[in-house]
A protein has these predicted regions:
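Hydrophobic, aromatic-enriched alpha-helical segments typical of multi-pass transmembrane helices
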Residues: 2-230
Length: 230
């Protein structure tokens, strides 16, 4: 791919670590994701706090950055021998992330209102939260979306392993989606680990791609100088 492509520009490559950074910041601010069926009062107090909405907005901004990062990875890897694999990795990852954004976006604006009503004495709101979001149609879509995203991240991992980018960065990247998608149900630590792996692997890949771009640019400049001097 041409080094002049916008996909290889500094700003575009910055989207890779930015997605990881926003995800980690959002998870730290949000804290453990409580279960309203186990501790309804604790969950309601957490969801009604200012941090809940703010943290989820940051997480969703990270997801938007991830959508763009999938296209960045396709631009970096699409012309390698794993080109077809990368296309499917990008497609599956975009579908998964788009489902996550559309569904959890509802939670950002609905759950805090329902939690405040519950704290004001409307116990029916707990049933609304459980039936509508945590065990209802939203959950029935989020988990398949997580499986789709996991497959996409694994395909990206394989493509990175076959490319000239750092192989182990690809391994770390392949672990991010399954941890972020499924760990929240049982372990905040593993969920946070998924965010940290996303930040580390994305930064590693962006740095390696940027250095490769500099080397290619220097090589082309040197060749041009040689041609002009002859």
């Amino acid at each position: 791919m041409s080094t002049n492509s916008p996909l290889r520009s500094r700003a575009s490559l910055a989207m890779l670590p930015l997605a990881g950074l926003l995800t980690v910041l959002g998870l730290i601010l949000r804290g453990p994701l409580g279960n309203p069926s186990i501790n309804p009062s604790g969950f309601a107090q957490s969801a009604a706090s200012a941090n809940f909405g703010t943290s989820w907005i940051i997480i969703l901004l990270g997801s938007v950055a991830r959508l763009y990062s999938f296209m960045i990875l396709f631009g970096l890897l699409g012309l390698t021998r794993a080109g077809k694999l990368v296309f499917w990795a990008m497609l599956l990852s975009i579908v998964s992330e788009a489902l996550f954004i559309s569904l959890t976006g509802i939670l950002v604006f609905t759950v805090p209102v329902a939690a405040q009503l519950y704290l004001q004495g409307d116990a029916h709101m707990l049933n609304v939260l459980m039936a509508g979001f945590f065990s209802g149609p939203v959950a029935s879509v989020l988990y398949p979306a997580g499986l789709i995203g996991t497959l996409g991240s694994i395909l990206f991992s394989i493509a990175i392993w076959r490319s000239n980018l750092p192989m182990w960065a690809g391994v770390l990247y392949g672990l991010t989606t399954p941890l972020l998608a499924f760990a929240p149900a049982f372990s905040y630590g593993l969920e946070l680990l998924g965010g940290l792996l996303l930040l580390v692997s994305s930064t590693w890949l962006a740095t390696a791609a940027w250095r490769q771009t500099i080397r290619e640019t220097s090589s082309r400049t040197g060749q041009s100088s040689m041609i002009s001097s002859t």
